[in-house]
From Swiss-Prot:
List of residues binding NADP(+): 56, 80, 105, 132, 222, 226
Name used for this protein in its record: Short-chain dehydrogenase/reductase bet4
EC number: 1.1.1.-
Stored InterPro entries: NAD(P)-bd_dom_sf, SDR_fam
Coiled coil: none
Pathway(s) this gene product operates in, as recorded in its UniProt entry: Mycotoxin biosynthesis
Organism: Neocamarosporium betae
Gene: bet4
Family per similarity comment: Belongs to the short-chain dehydrogenases/reductases (SDR) family.
One Pfam family linked to the record: adh_short
Amino acid sequence: MTPAKAPSHAKKPEAGSQPISSMWTQMFPPKPTYTEEHMPDLSGKIYIVTGASSGVGKETSRMLYSKNAKVYMAMRSGAKAAAAMADIQRAVPKSSGALVILPLDLADLSAVKKAAEEFVSLESSLHGLINNAGVQVLDDTNGEARTAQGHEIHIGVNVLGPFLFTQLLRGVLAATAGRAQPDTVRIVWVSSMGTETIGEKGRGLSADYVDYWPLMSPLERYGLSKAGNWLQGAECAKRYAGDGILSFPINPGHLKSELYREGGTLFKLALRPVLFPPAYGSYVELFAALSPTLSTKDSGAWIVPWGRLYPIRSDLLDATKSAAEGGNGHASAFWDWCEEQVKAFL
């Protein structure tokens, strides 16, 4: 494939400035506030965890299964998926829950739709959706990695795929919320600190990305895609509020996971001192998905390691507010843009 080129009018966006105090507390956080010890029995509850074949997704699936939940491990099928499920079953032999592989390829929107339709054909309840899966293609310096629909790989897999999957599951989530205890049906959007370190000033991520992304490094593209997840999590809280569904964008922390598998040796060595075991990322995901300290009033709030509400960069907060509220309304506009990109599959 020919290396990607930006159109002549494209230019790199201005990034906002993350306060040092914010960066420090997210890179070197206090001890976890929510662990396996805090989790209730989840018998009868059903969850989907995307990207469950390794790392944080696998750990989160294990923890939910250990509390007797039925967990749909949404991931690309194959030997790796089967091995991940077998590993969890061996680790938790006494669980009365269930593990089910749900084939999901976020790089193909038609496959995303098929996965959602398969789940809905099997289940009438869904108590939590954890959009954990993501890709970081650090060796794609020429911008040649694309999805089946031709989108740049980071925005396609990390932003549009999860968005479509969530929209297609809204009905079953809403139906479950109508029967469940208030504030217990939730969606978790796994973002990263890249939202604050790289995200566009006042916007996080915008539709302009489709023009300027060839000007950015693969690491920057990844960070910007995570800003997209933050926008989705914040806006979803508003759009789904009437359904009784809570939504939380999170920074799972800097973790030892396969997310960095594309990075070179020096890159991995540089990160080693600040990387934590995958279980710590699961603690953040499960705090967002299960903690009884969270309620409707918190929906849409930024959650950071290892399970804390924390203020997002102030200029980004403006994106979550309408003009009438003193903001710029960008989160709403970005949601509408995402809908436009996936409308053929809704």
